[in-house]
């Protein structure tokens, strides 16, 4: 089979140079976007595609019968195998959940930890989401470039030197305006193969799946082009064009919040209140466990002074058939299942969303109700008091006058 004869037969917008070698940009469904040397690509109809073509997996398996009439890319098997071995792991979610943190946004000592991204349709954080909740795709890179080029920057300066030179007094927050940028729908569905080269925003999947109001795959519905004005106060808003303007008060509140801690499979909290938890069923022998969403009411974050470790609810004598958590504080389940001893463990983490405990002066006592199934097929309600009547005998107690059959 003849290799592609001339690069002139291929659309120029799917061509690039990699280390001086002319390459064709191809989406590999098994990994991500690859740059295959043009000399290793066979002629097919993929060269006349108006969009970036995909790699023909049937050809790699020796089963494609279309030959030169195939609309996908045919490339040398050994070259594809070599390129796949060089591909870094695909971004999973965001920097907070294990993706590469290119700009050190997770370091609270770094000024990048004060950068938030404005997504108008989002309810999480009032629409101002920490940069660590995004993967570094093309729009984020473009916004960060606009941030760095919006003010003079001397070569060789580190972040602190640049910040001092650019702003004089360090700003309380930096807002990247992404209201006119589309959120990637395929990323939320674990189907995007463009990785950091995607032209859409890759938002944290926890935020996307818990915020049903987000507009995926198209420009946000509530987007309105902000007016241009000079920056004022302690916050700066940066758009892709590099302009700066004073942000709404919610932006400053989002920047003042600490870097969030991952809540596992639960939805992230918010400064004003949210739903957390997910419908989840687990089977342990004869015990069937289901967790359901619970309403979270947050209190004043200023009274939270220290984080708390895992609170052990003690052992119940009856296997759980239903666990419903209703609390005035933000809780998240430590493990995805209950232990064989049927101990219920909850992690009370004020640092996640600025919630606090009754013993810290908030006056909001948690109310955790566990409904169990007894041997007669009825249901009983158990109440867990983490402090107890005298502050020491905490544990699960059977509810008085609340049993139901």
Curated annotation (Swiss-Prot):
Keywords annotated in UniProt: Metal-binding, Repeat, RNA-binding, Translation regulation, Zinc, Zinc-finger
Zinc fingers, C3H1-type class: 55-77, 178-205
Disruption phenotype: RNAi-mediated knockdown causes abnormal differentiation of the bloodstream form into the procyclic form, a reduction in the expression of several mRNA including differentiation protein PAD1, and premature death. RNAi-mediated knockdown at the procyclic stage causes a decrease in growth rate. Simultaneous RNAi-mediated knockdown of ZC3H20 and ZC3H21 at the bloodstream stage is lethal. Simultaneous RNAi-mediated knockdown of ZC3H20 and ZC3H21 at the procyclic stage causes a severe growth defect and a shift towards a bloodstream form.
Gene: ZC3H20
Region span, Disordered: 381-405
Single GO molecular function: zinc ion binding
Protein name: RNA-binding protein ZC3H20
Quaternary data: Interacts (via MKT1-binding motif) with MKT1.
Keyword Zinc-finger: yes
